[in-house]
């Protein structure tokens, strides 16, 4: 990525003739963009609510040792690395009256939403190990459902657009709705405390969040019913062949590796933030809401600026700026011990502005890389 120039090779140039594998060019209407992006709320609720609260719930309410809780969450997420490509292969091969993306999105949305309930309705085995095994199994089931939804959802974004500008616009909308989903997730802990706290409070909260997750994800499935996605090219590849194709696509491989490191860093930050907020900065769990509300505002307000900047500078350059801004924000948190909680607002604003940048750029480059690969290989 660091070798990219102003004419970013990851961003697809405007082609004179569209490849046969992609849909006919079209202008994407605002209602379509809204309906498509709405699913990002449920997407982020599923990802961020467990990321922010699950470790705390397991250690503080289920009495699972932190190391065991960490392993219980980490191991199934490693397995998901292998499930994602299998979902992609399945989605590419589907040929149904409802398209090849939406059936998996429907199944995944339902499964992911039900898993939110399972995360916070844990059988009381009386021992830490059986409870950790249960949680690990639920994480595997839940994130399998998330893969079934998110993999075809992201692919659909590249198929909807016929130019780089449209793809960046789609991703900018998604980042805004992503910020809304993250904001809702941030209030989950405070909501659980306000409706009784403890295991019962978390269980009640999970019903509310599962309903929001399900309604927004399925709304996108319905809203995208008229979006034409290209049929599969008929070629079939084994999973090993799929990994070989990925390894041969250097642009995609670089982007995936960078994205993996980014998601790993974000995940560590989200998971540790609850402990950091309570035990280091000495703020209540409800402070999550204040921080992420400010972060959401930062993401939304900064999106037009990032979108404008993406027309002038390369994706890797903007990604670097956003990532450095995020890292600087994390360092500033170290100086927040026993400080006024009002400092959380400017920190949240800066974090949101930075994160909104590198998230939009990453999604945009991924979508463009997929479109470029379809152009070069004729396969979709």
PLM features per residue range, with description:
Residues 2-380:
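Membrane-embedded alpha-helical bundles of multi-pass transporters/translocases
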């Amino acid at each position: 990525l660091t070798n990219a120039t102003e004419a970013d090779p990851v961003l697809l140039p405007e082609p004179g003739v569209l490849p046969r594998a992609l849909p006919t060019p079209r202008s994407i209407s605002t209602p379509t963009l809204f309906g498509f992006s709405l699913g990002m709320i449920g997407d982020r609720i599923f990802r961020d609510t467990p990321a922010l609260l699950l470790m705390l719930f397991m250690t503080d309410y289920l009495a699972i040792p932190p190391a065991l809780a960490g392993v219980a969450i980490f191991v199934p997420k490693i397995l998901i690395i292998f499930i994602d490509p299998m979902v992609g292969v399945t989605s590419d091969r589907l040929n149904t009256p409802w398209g090849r993306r939406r059936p998996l999105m429907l199944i995944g949305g339902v499964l992911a939403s039900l898993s939110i309930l399972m995360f916070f309705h844990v059988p009381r085995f009386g021992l830490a190990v059986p409870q950790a095994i249960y949680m690990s199994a639920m994480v595997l089931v839940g994130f399998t459902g998330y893969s079934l939804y998110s993999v075809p959802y992201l692919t659909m974004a590249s198929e909807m657009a016929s130019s780089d500008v449209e793809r960046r616009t789609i991703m900018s909308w998604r980042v805004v709705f992503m910020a809304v989903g993250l904001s809702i997730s941030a209030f989950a802990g405070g909501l659980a405390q306000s409706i009784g706290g403890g295991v019962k409070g978390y269980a009640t909260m999970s019903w509310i969040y599962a309903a929001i997750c399900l309604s927004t994800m399925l709304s996108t499935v319905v809203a995208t019913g008229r979006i034409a996605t290209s049929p599969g090219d008929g070629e079939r590849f084994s999973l090993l062949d799929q990994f070989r194709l990925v390894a041969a696509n250097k642009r995609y491989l670089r982007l995936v590796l960078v994205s993996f490191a980014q998601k790993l860093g974000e995940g560590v930050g989200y998971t540790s933030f609850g402990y950091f907020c309570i035990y280091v900065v000495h703020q209540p769990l409800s402070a999550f809401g204040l921080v992420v509300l400010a972060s959401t505002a930062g993401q939304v307000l900064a999106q037009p600026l990032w979108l404008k900047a993406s027309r002038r500078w390369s994706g890797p350059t903007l990604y670097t700026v956003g990532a450095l801004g995020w890292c600087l924000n994390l360092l500033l948190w170290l100086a927040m011990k026993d400080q006024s909680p009002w400092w959380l607002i400017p920190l949240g604003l800066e974090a949101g502005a930075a994160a909104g940048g590198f998230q939009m750029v990453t999604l945009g480059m991924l979508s463009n890389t997929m479109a470029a690969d379809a152009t070069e290989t004729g396969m979709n």
